[in-house]
């Protein structure tokens, strides 16, 4: 197993060097605790036989994860990793696909075909259009309270 050290971060990636000096990276989106951590918290880690551990954050990054084919998330994965407010089960239902399948795409256990990925991205864009047109227009005024619907 390849060993890594000399770990560093920026706003999108975790970087590490292997024993040959080659630099590797992976998305910090896979590790929410590290993404939201302070620089001090990120530097407070230990190195074990199989990876890095942040005790205060209860987070582990394995050495092998730097070599995963999906170390950098796809567009579908990135969207759902950065928009946790989206209910995956309801989004899948709305699209007419199985929620477990969509979760597997998001978590990297399965890879969608190009057509399926396009279908998911189109559904994301449709949701965005619906959000952006919801109730806020130039002539928008809130509905009056029911007690003011008619004057005596």
What are these regions (language model features)?
Residues 1-152:
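Motif-centric detector for short Cys/His coordination patterns
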């Amino acid at each position: 197993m390849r060993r890594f050290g000399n770990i560093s971060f920026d706003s999108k990636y975790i970087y590490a060097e292997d024993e040959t000096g080659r630099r590797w990276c992976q998305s910090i989106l896979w590790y929410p605790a590290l993404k939201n951590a302070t620089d001090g918290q990120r530097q407070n880690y230990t190195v074990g036989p199989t990876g890095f551990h942040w005790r205060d954050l209860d987070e582990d990054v394995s050495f092998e994860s730097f070599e995963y084919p999906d170390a950098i998330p796809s567009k579908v994965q990135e969207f759902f990793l950065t928009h946790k407010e989206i209910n995956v089960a309801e989004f899948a239902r709305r699209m007419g696909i199985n929620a477990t399948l969509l979760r597997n795409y998001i978590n990297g256990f399965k890879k969608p075909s190009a057509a399926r990925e396009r279908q998911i991205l189109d559904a994301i864009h449709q949701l965005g259009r619906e959000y952006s047109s919801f109730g806020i227009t130039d002539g928008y005024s809130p509905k009056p309270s029911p007690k003011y619907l008619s004057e005596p």
